[in-house]
From Swiss-Prot:
Belongs to the EF-Ts family. This is Elongation factor Ts. GO terms for molecular function: translation elongation factor activity. Disulfide bonds: none annotated. It is found in: Cytoplasm.
Length: 287
């Protein structure tokens, strides 16, 4: 029997999302075999959906489906990346995506309702919280999509051009994550905020300089900010000598919209202090 070390318990905890003591017991039962412990924990089915409903699900997968004139981009979350790689989770995501695409759903609410029974069954089987988080459907003359692994997805709608161009621009979106379509969408508040940040970060460099020099420095930073934040003004990742907007224009196309999803984006993940948890468990055991 392999020794049940703290490192082994920590690894099992990170891979399954279960509590420290549950992981320790599972390892003891499995004779220190972490893979067997995982299989036993999944097979036990003792962890119910209700128990896991409050747990933060910030891992998971992005999925996308397109037919060239429409697309659905979907995010489904799990507690651990381990589950996101399992067939049961992948099947749930695939079935959810197919339903959303076939029914032309435009938001997640009806999909969440119709898939609730399947979600609860998955949670009961795998012992993790699972959530359908968000969904976007787009339509247009030309629609392209790109999926990077199962963690980042992007869709682009064009007027004119072809699917290959739309897909290439979607790949650029996935790589660069622009904030705006073009600089006209950038609000005065956003520009003012960028200006203030620049002034704070460069206070020492600016001190004592003539007003016109400072103004030129600010304008240079704002110009750079607009280029970095705007899709049409970004350098195309596959050919940095060409801006994305120019690429589309040369192909007789206009970029209408883009959507970017990244797994767990905006979800606050709990920060685990493993040493503190061990100390708390030991203290509780002594009482």
């Amino acid at each position: 029997m392999a020794a049940i070390t703290a490192a082994l318990v920590k690894e099992l905890r990170e891979r399954t999302g279960e509590g420290m003591m549950d992981c320790k017991k599972a390892l003891e039962k499995a004779g220190g075999d972490i893979e067997k412990a995982i299989d036993d924990m999944r097979a036990s089915g003792a962890i119910k959906a209700a128990k896991k409903a409050g747990n933060v699900a910030a891992e998971g997968a992005i999925a996308v489906k397109t037919d060239g004139t429409s697309a659905v981009l979907l995010e489904v979350n799990s507690q651990t990346d381990f589950l996101a790689l399992q067939d049961d989770f992948k099947n749930f995501v695939a079935e959810s995506l197919e339903e959303a695409f076939a029914q032309k759903l435009t938001d997640a609410a009806p999909l969440i309702a119709s898939r609730e029974a399947a979600r609860e069954a998955l949670v009961a089987k795998c012992g993790e919280n699972v959530n359908i988080r968000r969904l976007v459907r787009v339509e247009g003359d030309v629609v392209g999509a790109y999926l990077h692994g199962n963690k980042i997805g992007a869709v682009v709608v064009l007027k004119g051009g072809d699917v290959e161009l739309a897909k290439n621009i979607a790949m650029h979106v996935a790589a660069s994550n622009p904030e705006f379509l073009d600089s006209s969408e950038i609000s005065a508040e956003a520009i003012e905020r960028e200006k203030n940040v620049f002034l704070q970060l460069n206070a020492d460099k600016i001190a004592g300089k003539p007003e016109n020099i400072v103004e030129n420095m600010i304008n240079g930073r704002i110009t750079k900010f607009k280029a970095e934040a705007s899709l049409k003004e970004q350098a195309f990742v596959m050919n940095p000598e060409v801006k994305v907007g120019e690429l589309a224009k040369k192909a007789g196309a206009e970029i209408v919209s883009f959507t970017y999803f990244k797994v767990g984006e905006g979800i606050e993940k709990p920060v685990d202090d493993f040493a503190a948890e061990v100390a708390a468990q030991v203290a509780a055991a002594k009482q």
